[in-house]
Amino acid sequence: MKILFASSESYPFIKTGGLGDVSYALPKALRKIGIDARVIIPKYSDIPEYFRYNTHHIASFGVPVGWRSQYGGLEYYEYDGVPFYFIDNDYYFKRSGLYGYYDDGERFAYFSRGVLQAITYMQDFNPDIIQCNDWQTAIIPVLLKDHYRNYRNYNHIKTIFTIHNLKYQGVFGKSVLGELLCLNEGYYNENALKFYDGISFMKGGILFSDKLSTVSRTYAEEIKDPYYGEHLDGLLRSRSYDLWGIVNGIDYDILNPETDKDLFFNFDSSTLYNKTKNKIELQKMLNLPVSENIPMIGIVSRLVSQKGLDLISCVLEDLLQDGIQLVVLGTGDAKYENMFKYFAWKYPNKLSANIQFNNSLAQKIYGASDMFLMPSKFEPCGIGQLIALRYGSLPIVRETGGLKDTVRPFNPITGEGNGFSFTNYNAHDMLHVIRNAEYFYYNEKYNWNKLVQTAMNDDNSWSKSAEIYRNLYMSVL
């Protein structure tokens, strides 16, 4: 079985979020179970020089973009046993950053067409399935069925479209149809690409792919509801039978507290005293009062309302009256950045506000904190809570999307669970659950440590999800 994983980003070359992690870790896990999975991404100029200068050039070819033919280069690099292809074009990809340009519609129309053109030149690899990811590659199923269906190398290829975040849909003007995609006016209707007064790449992926998937079971149900459906819920309900919810995992080779070089001390579930040493060292590093007994709550997040920052803002001063330390890492909306800066000034012994993104510090926070706060308004899957579980930082989450699927609320009667959760999007519900966790930490330390061990021993690797993806692939062949 041969899978081509088309994505706009991938670790270790370039990433802005969870899609970049998935684009590497899932193909890696698939290859471990005998599936020939390969990845194709744009060759951005922001990719580190070591990688850019060591790719192997395979072919040069033309890529139709409307009436024009643009240069396309196909390059190859193998990393950690995973084959990667790159589409090279300086005009579209020799820029700072990945997204947010006025011509993003043209850039990713070009990339999508380039992926299909490149298949002819992949020598020993002809995919059975192209797995497309988010709006940047969502138009591939449309182009495949319209422009390539009669070609021998293409007429057997199936497509799966994976929705990582329905909120970002790739909506552009009607002129994109003919000028960039070479598609006729027949596609400009409610049963095709038309979306209000424009066209939606995301809608094309949902309508024209053979199967759909998204990144958790709960999110697959949520996006069929108008509250989460971003005006595509009706379309998703109509394809409900074809929609699979498969929770993401994390790469246990990389995210491993036993070997993580960013930690002060390595540890596992049987050496939790070393986790406590990490807390003490982080307290010293961040100029917080040093105490192994005070519970530390970590937040590693974009500082935006979607991540529940509006809830935190409502009760932050109340929370800082408790016997806790709060360590925050992230950037985002100025109002939330300034909020944390102000309260860090007002409560320097309680709050450390690190308004930056620093991966090494993030790992230290996961390794040192006792609890990890993630009260998202919506969360398709979420990776933070999975890393927190792996590192023994008990998640406190709102029950939405992948948070609901991966964090089992602690039951004080049975002792079951691996974290804490609340249902309603309500600041005082959140505060109540945080204080329940604080009480448990202070008054039942033995049982707290047992809960930490349960969390660390959970399997949130990609191995289970890779098997479910195998079943999804088999269902379309």
From Swiss-Prot:
Q: Which InterPro entries match?
A: Glyco_trans_1, GS/SS, Starch_synth_cat_dom
UniProt keyword annotations, A-Z: Glycogen biosynthesis, Glycosyltransferase, Transferase
Q: Does the keyword Glycosyltransferase apply?
A: yes
Tell me which residues bind ADP-alpha-D-glucose: K15
- Which Pfam family is one of this chain's hits? Glyco_transf_5
Mitochondrion keyword on record: no
- Top-level EC class, please? transferase
E.C. number, please?
2.4.1.21
Describe which pathway this protein belongs to, using the record's wording. Glycan biosynthesis; glycogen biosynthesis
GO MF term list: alpha-1,4-glucan glucosyltransferase (ADP-glucose donor) activity; alpha-1,4-glucan glucosyltransferase (UDP-glucose donor) activity
Domain of life (superkingdom) = Bacteria
Q: Which reaction does it catalyse?
A: [(1->4)-alpha-D-glucosyl](n) + ADP-alpha-D-glucose = [(1->4)-alpha-D-glucosyl](n+1) + ADP + H(+)
GO BP, sorted A to Z: glycogen biosynthetic process
Family of the protein in this entry: Belongs to the glycosyltransferase 1 family. Bacterial/plant glycogen synthase subfamily.
Q: What does this protein do?
A: Synthesizes alpha-1,4-glucan chains using ADP-glucose.
Q: Which NCBIfam families match?
A: glgA, PRK00654.1-1
PANTHER family recorded for this chain?
Answer: ALPHA AMYLASE DOMAIN-CONTAINING PROTEIN, GRANULE-BOUND STARCH SYNTHASE 1, CHLOROPLASTIC/AMYLOPLASTIC
Q: What is this protein called?
A: Glycogen synthase
Species classification: Bacteria, Bacillati, Bacillota, Clostridia, Eubacteriales
Instruction: Point out the gene that encodes the protein.
Output: glgA
